[in-house]
Amino acid sequence: MPTHQSLGGSTDEQLLQRMVASHRERFGEAYWAFFAARVAPRLPSPSVVIDLGCGPALLLQDLAQRHPAATLYGYDVTPAMIAHGRQLSYPGATPTLTVLDVSVQPLPHASGTVNLVSMASVLHVIDEPLPVLAEIRRVLAPGGIFLLNDWIRQPLQRYLAWRRDVMGERAPQDLRRGFRLFPVHSKYTTEDWQWLLGEAGFSIRDEVQLRDAHRIFVATVTGPG
């Protein structure tokens, strides 16, 4: 699959450091309030949880703090991300972290055994999302949740202003990276995501926009899983 590094002209280490630095902006109080209200009540205890495209595993660390009884798995295509996650401390059991490209490799889970699959700012990078969505659908247990958190289309001026003002990217090379990433991050509209989820056999139970140009969808399998 394409990577954020190849698309944005960054090294693995540069992307890792940006993800670590921006984690609280991406997964702050508003995110966890939404999670507690709209996602957590649907989960059994204990739960089996996958973060697909887990990056430096900070979201898994957050989940471990809030749901210490959960069995956590993280998958990412970049070895440096997995290595970072393995160095973190976690309440309860340490997540199983594995290098895996879900666009070409199946998830190592039996069908119908996972309660939550989270995918944050990753699916838009994958050229053919429907096979990946089918694999997520396969592993979800009855009543399981797919939590999709991804970019939605926005005007170029607003996108570049966000990179400058929120991400602090002000150098000439930052602007060049912004122009390279704009078509990737503005690939899908909200309606496109809604259609993709429906086409893949999911029903949207809830959705919210907590950050500019990002939308969260809480989806479950439609009909037999």
Feature map (PLM): residue ranges:
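Conserved class I S-adenosyl-L-methionine
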Residues: 1-45, 58-62
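Short glycine-centered segments of the SAM/dcSAM-binding site in methyltransferase folds
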Residues: 48, 144-145
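Class I SAM-dependent methyltransferase SAM/SAH-binding core
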Residues: 50, 56-105
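Short conserved loop adjoining the S-adenosyl-L-methionine
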Residues: 106-111
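A conserved beta-strand element that flanks and buttresses the S-adenosyl-L-methionine
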Residues: 118
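Short catalytic micro-motifs in class I SAM-dependent methyltransferases
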Residues: 121-122
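A short glycine-rich, Lys/Arg-flanked "PGG" loop and its adjoining helix->strand segment in the class I
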Residues: 130-142
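C-terminal alpha-helical "lid/dimerization" subdomain adjacent to the S-adenosyl-L-methionine
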Residues: 149-200, 205-208, 213
